[in-house]
Amino acid sequence: KYNNVKIENGSLAHYNNDKKRWQLLFAHERTGLHELTVYAKRNNNNESSSRSVVRFDLDVNKLRRPMKFPLIYSQFHTKKCQIYTPLDGVLKKGSIVPIHCIVPGATEVNLTVDSQWLNSEGYTDPILQRQITVGSSDIVIYAKYEQKSNYNGLVKYSVR
């Protein structure tokens, strides 16, 4: 929070597959005092809501480059995915961007650019690594699991 307002896409929780633990990242857009609250729940807990487990006050006195993380869908956390690059959730129109993520256990991983499916390439379980040319609207990473015919959304990037 900044001035008691939640920062949209200002944090990213992803599973560090090398260290076998969750990693929490924070992206601030302004200098000043920020309140970081971590919410959690146990995997075997049937409750739908998480509860606050720790709170940090962070005083940001220098801003190098403001950013937002991409929008993360629930399947990203359920499947313990991880983003290496790009961490910035807002991509520049027309730029060529490397995509590097860990997507464990998927049978297929693909992307849409401007709502158009790309050729499926660059995924060998658990690594997705490829380059894309950013279009004029959203980029979404999808994964298929087991014998299911539908894709689940994992990560959504916006375009400026």
For the regions a protein language model found, what residue spans apply to each?
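Mixed-charge, low-complexity segments
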Residues: K1-R160
